[in-house]
Amino acid sequence: LPILNLFPDYTEKHTDGSNQFIYSRFLVPHLMEYTGKAIFIDGDMIVRDDIVKLWNLTNGHTHWDVAVVKHDYQTKMTEKYLGAKNENYPRKNWSSVMIWNCNTYPNRKLTPEFIENATGAELHRFTWIDDDRILELPKEWNWLPDEFGPNLDAKLLHYTLGTPCFHEFATTPQGEEWHREHMLADYCLQRTDI
């Protein structure tokens, strides 16, 4: 389901991103009508543990607007999948796994109009949220094997440079897990009695 089709009052105007949908993630609180909490994860990931465990990591915390893995690294490549640009910037990949506290006052600023007019830097750096209200999640919940190497304890693998379906990333660390999941997703039980 293309999420942008759910927002007739939103027009994607950004030209500074690697793809046309990288800003739609910030529409999640609006989609949730600014109530409850919600998880957003990028599409180039494999969740290796029960996602309820991720959901529960915010339980018991009262003063937070968003929960993220607070990566601090420099990328290995200036170009990623399909020739998309890959730049270093503060808080890189923080917005790739988020638990939103949708009903907080700061997140009510995330209207379609605000997102259309904010820069990518403003959005991906969470400039409308005070730093002390950005809850930190364990790094295992947004592990970047193509940047950090393999981690058998990772709860979520994020192939941020390019999924192993692209030839140039086919042998990326822990790429075999991607290939296995792809094979299982495409598997179809066949009749053997013919």
Language-model features: where?
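A glycosyltransferase accessory/donor-loop signature
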Residues: 2, 97-194
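Active-site-proximal specificity loops/subdomain of glycosyltransferases
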Residues: 1-34
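Short, P/G- and charge-enriched loop/turn segments at secondary-structure junctions
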Residues: 13-17, 82-87
